[in-house]
From Swiss-Prot:
Function: May be involved in the regulation of mesenchymal cell differentiation through transactivation of NOTCH1 target genes.
Biased composition (Basic and acidic residues): 543-554, 600-610
SMART domains assigned: ZnF_C2H2 (SM00355)
Annotated Gene Ontology cellular component terms: cytoplasm; megasporocyte nucleus; nucleus
Superkingdom of origin: Eukaryota
Covalent S-S links between cysteines: none
Protein's name in the database: Zinc finger protein 64
UniProt organism field: Homo sapiens
Subcellular location per the Swiss-Prot or TrEMBL entry: Nucleus
Main localization of the protein described in the UniProt heading: nucleus
Key words, A-Z: DNA-binding, Isopeptide bond, Metal-binding, Nucleus, Phosphoprotein, Repeat, Transcription, Transcription regulation, Ubl conjugation, Zinc, Zinc-finger
Family the UniProt entry places it in: Belongs to the krueppel C2H2-type zinc-finger protein family.
Taxonomic path: Eukaryota, Metazoa, Chordata, Craniata, Vertebrata
Compositional bias per record (Polar residues), positions renumbered to this chain: 622-631
Gene Ontology molecular function terms on file: DNA binding; zinc ion binding
Amino acid sequence: MNASSEGESFAGSVQIPGGTTVLVELTPDIHICGICKQQFNNLDAFVAHKQSGCQLTGTSAAAPSTVQFVSEETVPATQTQTTTRTITSETQTITVSAPEFVFEHGYQTYLPTESNENQTATVISLPAKSRTKKPTTPPAQKRLNCCYPGCQFKTAYGMKDMERHLKIHTGDKPHKCEVCGKCFSRKDKLKTHMRCHTGVKPYKCKTCDYAAADSSSLNKHLRIHSDERPFKCQICPYASRNSSQLTVHLRSHTASELDDDVPKANCLSTESTDTPKAPVITLPSEAREQMATLGERTFNCCYPGCHFKTVHGMKDLDRHLRIHTGDKPHKCEFCDKCFSRKDNLTMHMRCHTSVKPHKCHLCDYAAVDSSSLKKHLRIHSDERPYKCQLCPYASRNSSQLTVHLRSHTGDTPFQCWLCSAKFKISSDLKRHMIVHSGEKPFKCEFCDVRCTMKANLKSHIRIKHTFKCLHCAFQGRDRADLLEHSRLHQADHPEKCPECSYSCSSAAALRVHSRVHCKDRPFKCDFCSFDTKRPSSLAKHVDKVHRDEAKTENRAPLGKEGLREGSSQHVAKIVTQRAFRCETCGASFVRDDSLRCHKKQHSDQSENKNSDLVTFPPESGASGQLSTLVSVGQLEAPLEPSQDL
């Protein structure tokens, strides 16, 4: 047995007699020849032994105490032809017929045999007592190592798995998608990708309606319900649900924090505990140095005045730079609109497809994106989180608050480049630019009139197409014109004005209307020669022109002073002498039309209108008040004129 230093390692190709080249990459450990069972502590000596040509000699009967323990699971079941088992009190001998293996600590690398003849391998194990002291020692497994420098990939699933891994380095992608043309190095990746086109999501969550195309996405989703955060930072209490979030978080720590605070011991300890511990990522020394370098790397925008910073790599910075360069590589297939980011294009495509997946549970509103739905929900909750610090104003979104703050600062950032007009919001500027362009985009749906602004179109429709007579082709300018014209088609108005086409249902209303045609202007001003037909016009004149003079002479406001002849109060006093009382409830009125409106409330007495009116002759006393007992049906009540007229 040859012994040498244990600190060396080997990585390279080994030429075995017979023309077979085998890649070997092993860590320093005990190496056992699969033919003669000779042991080597040095890998170079073991390779030299294999190159010199191994023959089955007497060295195969080595001492049991120096032979590494190999369990029965070491030999694959498919390769075993005959197995004999002899159990003694000290040792256990297993004789198998199998290809040649190289056994090492926890690994086995398959080496092809030099001839087609089956070789008989005798494996001698340690005593049973010594094996019972280490029940946790895992059985040795057959593993293949990647030959590319720096790659630590190892597999125990044979050469096929190794070949799939090597496609990562070679870039070979033989599996192509028939729908989009995307290529994959593995067939199972293509199968998972095809679910994006077919929409098949076989992995469903038992807690909610979530469904995923692959099991890994479902496992990540389940951590949301369980609030499991297995990936923990060793520097601070931060914990995340997936490794990518932890990798981004580690960039926030500086190199000094990584060197001082990261513990040297491996977190995956072999000590047995009652409760299982959550896995913690422990970075190797090289990876920690790389992460420390990334932690100090902050990508800043190179444009003057821009303070954008990112720790998410160059891709995030490239997306930001498109704002300055104006590069919009993502173009819509239905319109000419372009976008700088692909996710913005995906959201824009919903405008053409009318897909609105985000629906309100309180009304029928549906939104294209979740942010629009959140803004809509604030209408139901009346939530106004954006508050002005200068006044009590509060808004539902930040854009409304930004526009409101311009009313305090007087800022008008949107200026017309053809004139000196300035505006607070961009929509006002767009409406203003239509004036310069002469464009009239708003067309009337009833005629050929076009307007530059929507407000002008609404005014046109209201004037020209709203106040239209239903019986003829008359078109009024406003509601008053239409009401005046509609009286021509009303045959149930017996009272008609002899001067115009006005008609009404009562004589009192006709008397009020007759003042329009009367040349007499009984209401005269005491301070000037102004006269009018209406008392309200006189009151407005005095209040507007002679307010100071009325205060100087200590005159009471019109309506509270003494009754003078010809005034509106005097006329009301005369009309009061013809009082109209309701027979049903006893209510009294000055005008008969007021009584008629009141009688409509008594639907059971509305048939006989003539019997509803009772006229009482006046009997004025010394004070000018009426105190005559009148009989209304079977009810006797004193009639007192109202003093509020």
